[in-house]
């Protein structure tokens, strides 16, 4: 379902899209302006997780960080590979069940996250992180300008050169297909482009 305000089973009010099969989501914002998101980790092998990763952004906006980290450490092997990011107006936190040292604080700055660990230097991540950082710096506090200029960057369907492609075990043709920020395909592709800004006072756009 499209992004909208709804109430989770635990009673948390969130702005999020919704997987109508599992009930989870990939990106969520609560009324306090806290943001959470999950991405899959590309591993080149069938996924074996027993619990849907879509529950994680919702849990990240409900549980305390301490309880969330304990839950993730206890259940890490029950999920297929994932990256979870939780952001508040004060700080951020990142957890991946494929990280050698899962659970780390994120400090103020510009970061990139795709379908591997945080800051993994894939071509599209490097390109987007630089462009997004420049755009944010130039836009200042004008959220409307920022949204309008970030969306075309995220919708770039230009593939990376072959010599820069990572090897994630899916073969050259698939690596090439997956190398653009916005993926266009008949059976697989990017479904949505979302830009969320939260002001220091908690105003969400």
Task: List each language-model region with its residue ranges.
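N-terminal nucleophile
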Residues: 1-205
């Amino acid at each position: 379902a499209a992004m909208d305000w709804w109430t989770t089973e635990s009673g948390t009010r969130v702005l999020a899209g919704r997987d109508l099969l599992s009930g989870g989501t990939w990106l969520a914002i609560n009324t306090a302006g806290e943001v959470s998101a999950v991405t899959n980790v590309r591993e080149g092998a069938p996924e074996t997780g027993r619990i849907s990763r879509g529950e994680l952004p919702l849990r990240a906006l409900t549980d305390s960080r301490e309880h969330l980290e304990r839950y993730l450490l206890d259940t890490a092997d029950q999920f297929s590979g994932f990256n979870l990011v939780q952001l508040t107006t004060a700080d951020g936190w990142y957890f991946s069940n494929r990280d050698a040292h899962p659970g780390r604080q994120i400090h103020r700055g510009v970061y990139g996250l795709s379908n591997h660990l945080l800051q993994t230097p894939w071509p599209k991540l490097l390109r987007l992180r630089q462009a997004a950082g420049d755009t944010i710096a130039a836009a200042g506090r004008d959220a409307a300008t920022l949204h309008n200029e970030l969306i075309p960057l995220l919708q770039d369907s230009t593939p990376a050169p072959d010599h820069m492609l990572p090897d994630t075990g899916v073969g050259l043709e698939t690596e090439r297909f997956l190398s653009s920020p916005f993926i266009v395909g008949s059976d697989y592709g990017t479904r949505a482009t979302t830009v969320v800004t939260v002001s220091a006072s908690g105003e969400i756009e």
